[in-house]
């Protein structure tokens, strides 16, 4: 019987409360969007298998929604994480400023060399933008990581972001060729759909 997957990667989403972490996970794992989640309740984790570089990668994506204030609880989640996605809300400048604190948290708690990815969520709310894309690109380049602007509501760049992180983990682990698959840090793939408006405020 064929194996269901070649690799299992544990991913973790961190960031301030209300930036849309749970919505991103639900969009990625179930391709659905619901803005009625209760902000203090996380979903633990969701699983989705993706094809990357000819390999079946099972992604176990952990949510930390509602636990941002309990640093010790969140610390336990770092254990075993191979990739960490830092999420901010493009309409909330404070959530972007706090990315530096989350970077520090990764350094203190996560495994050395863990892959990281920066996501600016809710990019469908362009009219309410407070964080310019150039600011995020600069930050991503300073840390040598990739950056995407996403929308859990319109699904923009969600699959691309998760697959990109999975590919980086795979290549780093020597699971496949390491040629030109890497995209320069600080870039995203496609512009966000500005027609939709996001109401998801959950972690």
Curated annotation (Swiss-Prot):
Domain of life: Eukaryota
Gene name linked to the record: RAB13
A molecular function (GO) term: GTP binding
Protein name: Ras-related protein Rab-13
Membrane topology field: Lipid-anchor
UniProt lineage: Eukaryota, Metazoa, Chordata, Craniata, Vertebrata
Pfam families in UniProt: Ras
Pro-sequence residue ranges: 201-203
Compartments, record wording: Cell membrane; Cytoplasmic vesicle membrane; Cell junction, Tight junction; Golgi apparatus, trans-Golgi network membrane
CDD domains given in the database record: Rab8_Rab10_Rab13_like
Enzyme's top EC category: hydrolase
The species this protein was found in: Canis lupus familiaris (Dog)
């Amino acid at each position: 019987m064929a194996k269901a997957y070649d690799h299992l990667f544990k991913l973790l989403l961190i960031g301030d409360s209300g930036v849309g972490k749970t919505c991103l996970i639900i969009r990625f794992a179930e391709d659905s969007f619901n803005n009625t989640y209760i902000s203090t309740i996380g979903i633990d984790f969701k699983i989705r298998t993706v094809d990357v570089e000819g390999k079946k990668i099972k992604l176990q994506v952990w949510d930390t929604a509602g636990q941002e204030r309990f640093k010790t609880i969140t610390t336990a989640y770092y254990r075993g994480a191979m990739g960490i996605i830092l999420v901010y809300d493009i309409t909330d400048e404070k959530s972007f400023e706090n990315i530096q604190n989350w970077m520090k948290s990764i350094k203190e708690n996560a495994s050395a060399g863990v892959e990281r990815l920066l996501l600016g969520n809710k990019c469908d709310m362009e009219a309410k933008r407070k964080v310019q894309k150039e600011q995020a690109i600069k930050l991503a380049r300073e840390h040598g990581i990739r950056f995407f602007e996403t929308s859990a509501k319109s699904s923009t760049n969600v699959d691309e972001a998760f697959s990109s992180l999975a590919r980086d983990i795979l290549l780093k682990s020597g699971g496949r060729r390491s040629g030109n698959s890497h995209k320069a840090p600080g870039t995203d793939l496609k512009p966000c759909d500005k027609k939709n408006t996001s109401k998801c405020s959950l972690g």
